[in-house]
């Protein structure tokens, strides 16, 4: 059966994001993925030493100064017969709620682990978010050109800490100065390592068969024997790859390599296009929308301010769920009920914007936005429904914000509410006093907010520390119990930017005790937009 041209386009799409701890090599992998997809011919070392060459996926003034990717940019590139959309996720200590929300807009994730360090804190947090939708995960063990931990130990750690089974696809031969290549368990082939730096992809020498004498000649008898011994262990002790379990988010195929040395990234990409799902169906408040439907639907998962320093515009990033976008099409913004003609949607190659004529499910569009679009907004061709699963996440860091000029309270509140609608930060107004508390997931969000308040709203603000450890959105089906809860905890209650009631806890101990005391009240870590 031949698929219609529309369904062929849908079937070609793969949309994924990379999750990792800072410095596990995410930006390098991003560049090498684009290199193998021929999207950029020179993958510049990320912080070009002494040169002004910036990595392709870093932008905005602050990013330029710090050499980090604050903004979740989007890159599209062809690979084999597929079109791959890679959503970049801010990686440093400077990551934000955008990073979490971006994971709600993809169909698959690549987890990058520094093989010298293993599972680290940020990776754990990001994996928790992927669990909200059981997103399929591929794993790349990076930095094999350095001395790494025992590979079996790494697999055990992923399984135990992240509660996902590991199915090794390739297996390393040596590491550091002795790194010789990887063996592919399912193709019975060894790929020999020759370092390719920058944008040179070396021709890889392949040795067929595990017992081929050429293998001993190429890597040395000791390493060849060690490989055979390890593989016996691996095949006995680890999971076989099973596509169904992968799609259910229960096992992860594991690849080994070095992104810096341009080695192993293509094996992972081959796996990604072969196994990662084409655009998936998504839930709305009324029904499930399939990617095969021809009527257009999409949702906004992120709003980016000021991508163009010359203009103060904002761009809303929209994930296409179904249907084909065509230039000049009329779409309904469900929240406002208004119909808008969209003739200037953008597609991105990180920072280079170009206007797009058409887009399909899995693609990401940039919509110009002058403050009228919010995170979580659904666009359709008229159907009144709202996509679910684009949450706010409970902040982990809090500051009180204070004005240098107290007469500008009105501008401050307006600025903060707009910034919170964009997802730059969350705002809480305690019920019992006139404080304004801002909450964030990453420290850099605080700097961004003060800088933007000054440049966009002409408001100078400073931060003070505040006695808040965490926040939870509260609700209850029992009105009487809820009233009692509100009465007795007034000093810990606040309203967020959307006027939702929030419990702000001074300590985790306080939160746990309060939850025990009020079993009829729900304390939520996430809130739907």
Curated annotation (Swiss-Prot):
The keyword Nucleotide-binding applies. Transmembrane segments: none annotated. Pfam families: EF-G_D2 (PF22042), GTP_EFTU (PF00009), RF3_C (PF16658). NCBIfam families: prfC, PRK00741.1, small_GTP. This is Peptide chain release factor 3. It comes from Salmonella typhimurium (strain LT2 / SGSC1412 / ATCC 700720). GO terms for biological process: regulation of translational termination; translational termination. It is found in: Cytoplasm. The keyword Lipid biosynthesis does not apply. Residues 11-280 form the tr-type G domain. GTP binds at residues 20-27, 88-92, 142-145. Keywords: Cytoplasm, GTP-binding, Nucleotide-binding, Protein biosynthesis. Increases the formation of ribosomal termination complexes and stimulates activities of RF-1 and RF-2. It binds guanine nucleotides and has strong preference for UGA stop codons. It may interact directly with the ribosome. The stimulation of RF-1 and RF-2 is significantly reduced by GTP and GDP, but not by GMP. Its main location: cytoplasm. Belongs to the TRAFAC class translation factor GTPase superfamily. Classic translation factor GTPase family. PrfC subfamily.
């Amino acid at each position: 059966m031949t698929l219609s041209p529309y369904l062929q386009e849908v079937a070609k799409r793969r949309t994924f994001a990379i999750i990792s701890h800072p410095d596990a090599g995410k930006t390098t992998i991003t560049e090498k993925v684009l290199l193998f997809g021929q999207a950029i011919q020179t993958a510049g070392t990320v912080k070009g030493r002494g040169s002004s060459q910036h990595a392709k996926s870093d932008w905005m003034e602050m990013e330029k100064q710090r050499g980090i990717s604050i903004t979740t940019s989007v890159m599209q590139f062809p690979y084999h017969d597929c079109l791959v959309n890679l959503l970049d996720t801010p990686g440093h200590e400077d990551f934000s709620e955008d990073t979490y929300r971006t994971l709600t807009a993809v169909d698959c994730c690549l987890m990058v682990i520094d093989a010298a360090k293993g599972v680290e804190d940020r990776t754990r947090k990001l994996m928790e978010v992927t669990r909200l939708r059981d997103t399929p995960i591929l794993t790349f063990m990076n930095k094999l050109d350095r001395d790494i931990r025992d590979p079996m130990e790494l697999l055990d750690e992923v399984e135990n800490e992240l509660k996902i089974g590991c199915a090794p696809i390739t297996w390393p031969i040596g590491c550091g100065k002795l790194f010789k290549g990887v063996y592919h368990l399912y193709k019975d082939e060894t790929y020999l390592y020759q370092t390719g730096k920058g944008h040179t992809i070396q021709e890889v020498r392949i040795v067929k068969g595990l017992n081929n004498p050429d293998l001993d000649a190429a890597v040395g008898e000791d390493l060849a024997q060690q490989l055979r011994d390890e593989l016996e262990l691996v095949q006995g002790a680890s999971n076989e790859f099973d596509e169904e379990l992968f799609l259910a988010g229960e096992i992860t195929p594991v690849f080994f390599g070095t992104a810096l040395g341009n080695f192993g990234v293509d094996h992972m990409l081959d796996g990604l296009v072969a196994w990662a799902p084409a655009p998936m169906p998504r839930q709305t408040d009324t029904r499930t929308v399939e990617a095969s439907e021809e009527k257009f639907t999409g949702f906004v998962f992120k709003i980016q301010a000021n991508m163009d320093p010359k203009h103060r515009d904002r761009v809303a990033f929209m994930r296409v769920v179904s249907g084909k976008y065509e230039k000049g099409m009329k779409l309904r913004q469900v929240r406002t009920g208004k119909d808008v003609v969209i003739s200037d949607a953008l597609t991105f190659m990180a920072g280079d914007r170009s206007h797009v004529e058409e887009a399909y499910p899995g693609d990401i569009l940039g919509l110009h936005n002058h403050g009228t679009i919010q995170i979580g907004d659904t666009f359709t061709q008229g159907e009144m429904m709202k996509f679910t699963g684009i949450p706010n996440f409970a902040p982990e860091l809090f500051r009180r914000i204070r004005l240098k000029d107290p007469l500008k309270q009105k501008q401050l509140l307006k600025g903060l509410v707009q910034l919170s609608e964009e997802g730059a930060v969350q705002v809480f107004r305690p019920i019992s006093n006139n404080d304004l508390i801002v909450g964030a997931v990453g420290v850099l969000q605080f700097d961004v907010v003060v800088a933007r308040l000054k440049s966009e709203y002409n408001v100078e603000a400073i931060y003070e520390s505040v006695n808040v450890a965490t926040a939870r959105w509260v609700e209850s089906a029992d009105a009487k119990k809820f009233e009692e809860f509100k009465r007795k905890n007034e000093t810990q209650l606040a309203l967020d930017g959307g006027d939702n009631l929030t419990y702000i806890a001074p300590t985790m101990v306080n939160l746990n005790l309060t939850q025990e005391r009020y079993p009829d009240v729900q304390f939520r870590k996430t809130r739907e937009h």
